[in-house]
Every structure is written in structure tokens, then in C-alpha cells.
């Protein structure tokens, strides 16, 4: 998987490159050159997966050859295993039409844990 800049003049990079680079050298954002597609069967097969396993499955096409799929799964399990709730980000029904996604079960009790616990581990790779 290659990533290209939204401004068009930075070199295309793989997942490892964009993870370390952050913003593109031309000031743009890196986006996938092509968006991965999941079939209805693949999506159905993800139903009921633990959060960490689901995260790894969805991320794998974006990661491509930058990281072995088994290693990605280990990292997602390590990152989200630190959360205080088994569902990681439980969805709680408040009433008939309102739901609340709880993003505060990470180690710092902040929404940013959902992304940054894994990102720190990816930097170490």
C-alpha cells in the first residue's frame, strides 16, 4: 500500500514511511493511493471479533508489507489489552434513540488512548 500527499508533490511512501513522517514534505496529508475494499463476506466474518483482532484485520490492508500480519495482531492486542474494559470502547445505549461510545477506558482515561496506545508501539517497530 502506498500513500500519496493531498498536495501532490511529496514522494509516495509506504505505511512505515507515513507513520514516521506524519505530514508530507509538501505540507499535505498522506492518504492511501487506493482505498481497500472489504467484501460483505469479509465484513460478516469480522462480526464478534475482539476489538484488538478487529483493529488488526481492518488495518492490515493499510499496513501492507510494512508489518507482518501476525506482528500487527500482537501489537493491537498489546495496545488494547491495557484498557480497563474488555470491549475497549463499549457502546452504551442511553435510551431508545441515543447511544454513547465510551472512549475513556484507556490507561490515561482520555479518548486519545484509542489511537496513541497503538501508535507508540508502531513507532517502536
Regions found by a protein language model. Name each.
Residues 1-125:
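PLP-dependent amino-acid enzyme catalytic core
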Amino acid at each position: 500500500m502506498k500513500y500519496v500527499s493531498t498536495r501532490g508533490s511529496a514522494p509516495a511512501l509506504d505505511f512505515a514511511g507515513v507513520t514516521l513522517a506524519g505530514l508530507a514534505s509538501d505540507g499535505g496529508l498522506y492518504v492511501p493511493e487506493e482505498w481497500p475494499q472489504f467484501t460483505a463476506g469479509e465484513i460478516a466474518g469480522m462480526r464478534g471479533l475482539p476489538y484488538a483482532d478487529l483493529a488488526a484485520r481492518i488495518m492490515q490492508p493499510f499496513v501492507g508489507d510494512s508489518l507482518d500480519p501476525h506482528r500487527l495482531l500482537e501489537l493491537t492486542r498489546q495496545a488494547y489489552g491495557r484498557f480497563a474494559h474488555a470491549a475497549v470502547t463499549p457502546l452504551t445505549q442511553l435510551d431508545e434513540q441515543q447511544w454513547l461510545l465510551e472512549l475513556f477506558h484507556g490507561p490515561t482515561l482520555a479518548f486519545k488512548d484509542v489511537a496513541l496506545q497503538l501508535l507508540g508501539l508502531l513507532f517502536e517497530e
